[in-house]
Design a protein with these regions (language model features):
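A cross-kingdom feature that marks ATP-driven nucleic-acid transaction machinery
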Residues: 1-142
């Protein structure tokens, strides 16, 4: 409704461009949620560790560190899965892995050999062997 009168006056093309440019700004939170839901499906389908009992995002006490997905295992609720989802079309997996490893230092504890999962909208480059990758095609099973 906000731009309706401008569209009716013939400015539809420029209004569409304006709205399209703002979509990326709004997609971060829904994308991260879709990423977490996909990881939960992978746990329940047996594609990831079956001992994961909780999976969600994590923030440290002062909210300076956020991890998009942390999977906790066993009675001790030890973090065994760490994930980062970026809405960018192409992301560097090695860079995302380094960022996740740095963020993991803020966790009270973490498994000795956690699963690292990184996600981008279309493609990941420079993928280390120690990281699992996902794209929108995986998340939405396209």
């Amino acid at each position: 409704e906000r731009y309706r009168s401008q569209i009716e006056r013939g400015l539809g093309r420029s209004v569409a461009a304006l709205l399209e440019s703002g979509i990326d700004d709004a997609m971060g939170i829904p994308w991260e949620e879709a990423f977490r839901r996909h990881l939960i499906r992978e746990v329940t389908d047996g594609a990831l560790r079956s001992d994961i009992v909780a999976l969600g995002q994590w923030w440290n006490e002062d909210s300076s560190v956020e991890i998009d997905a942390v999977g906790l295992a066993g009675r001790s609720s030890t973090p065994v899965l760490l994930g980062e989802a970026k809405w960018g079309r192409v992301e560097n997996a090695a860079s995302l892995l380094r960022s996740l490893q740095n963020k993991a230092r803020a966790l009270p504890t973490v498994a000795d050999d956690p699963i690292y999962v990184v996600c981008a909208r279309e493609r990941l480059t420079d993928v280390p062997r120690s990281v699992q990758t996902l794209t929108a095609a995986d998340v939405f099973d396209v």
